[in-house]
Each structure stands twice: as structure tokens, then as C-alpha cells.
Amino acid sequence: MAALNVLVSGCGRFLRGLLTGPTVTSWARPPARGFREVVEIQEGKTTIIEGRITGTPKESPNPPNPSGQCPICRWNLKHKYSYEDVLLLSQFIRPHGGMLPRSITGLCQEEHRKIEECVKMAHRAGLLPNHRPKLPEGFFPKTRPRLNRYLTRWSPRSVKPIYNKGHRWNKVRMAVGSPLLKDNVSYTGRPLVLYH
């Protein structure tokens, strides 16, 4: 049904374009999606509510730093994003989750590496669930091995975390985050700790 409507409206535009002459050049193009506003018109006892197409909006505003070498630098976002900003990160990734190359994104080398690290961290945190490569038909992925395979003698639920990983002056710390993001702005009073 939708295909029939598109065909009929396309033929109608084509015929209108032929009848009005060569002065109108927009008949061959599909209709542009403009912004619409709702207008109420009162005629006696009847109220007509119609949507009118308004003019197209202005182009995007000028960046605050037009001399920057990449989009992140131009919009002064250099140290102001993290792996949680998925709307920003989704502009630099492909539909299946991989990074777009620098020739397409226009990022400088430093920011490309930071965005790449943030995308990895967002994938690991489960913040980008829709960006996964599609599996071919009939292919079933292998089940992942359970993480605590070494605990086969007792139930995995009986495990307690290791609260004390050594003396305070000689603890074995776990790496968290990425050293590439160490210059990012911290909005809390605590300093950034890369080892917990």
C-alpha cells in the first residue's frame, strides 16, 4: 500500500511539473521534510486545525573554536567526555560497533585514540548493546566458558571476594580505566585513580 502511494504521488508530481513548465525545477525531487507548525483557523462555528510546513531551520551554529584541527577541538570538548557519553561516541562508530577511520571522522591522532578507548570501555560496560555485528543465518555462537572454572570443588555462590590484597603499602592493585583519559575533567573533588 505504501509503495502504491509513493508511486501515485511521484506520478502526480511528474505530471504537475510537465504542466507548469520548465520554470519549476523541484518537481523531480522528492518532497523535503520541513518543520511543521500546527495552525488553528476559526471560521464561524468550525475550527480547522492544519499543519503548515515552515521554512527550513538555520544551519548549525558556528563552533566556538573554528581554528581547531578536529571536531572535538573545534567544539571545546577536548577533556570533557568519557565512556558514558554514548551519544557523542555513537557518531564515530560503524553500525556493527567498530570505529570509523580518521579519514572519515576528521579527528586528530590523539582524540581518535581517546575516542577508540572510550568506545572499548562503553562496549565492556554494556552501554552500546545495539552495536554488534550480525551473525550469519544458521550460525550459533559458541557458549562462553564460565569465568570461575577453577572453582569446581565448591559452588560458585559460596565464593567470597578477597577484601585484603596485601598490606596497605604493598597492595596488588587492579587497573581501572585508561591512562589515555587521565587528563579529563573530573567534576568530583576526588582525584582520578587508575588503580583500585
From Swiss-Prot:
Keywords: Mitochondrion, Ribonucleoprotein, Ribosomal protein, Transit peptide
Subcellular localization, as worded in the UniProt entry: Mitochondrion
SUPFAM superfamilies documented for this protein: Ribosomal protein S18
Pfam family, one: Ribosomal_S18
One GO BP: translation
Location of the transit peptide in the chain: 1-34
GO molecular function: small ribosomal subunit rRNA binding; structural constituent of ribosome
GO cellular component: mitochondrial inner membrane; mitochondrial small ribosomal subunit
Superkingdom of the organism of origin: Eukaryota
Coiled-coil boundaries: none
Cited PANTHER family: 30S RIBOSOMAL PROTEIN S18, LARGE RIBOSOMAL SUBUNIT PROTEIN ML66
Subunit structure: Component of the mitochondrial ribosome small subunit (28S) which comprises a 12S rRNA and about 30 distinct proteins.
Family designation: Belongs to the bacterial ribosomal protein bS18 family. Mitochondrion-specific ribosomal protein mL66 subfamily.
Protein name stated in the entry: Large ribosomal subunit protein mL66
Lineage summary: Eukaryota, Metazoa, Chordata, Craniata, Vertebrata
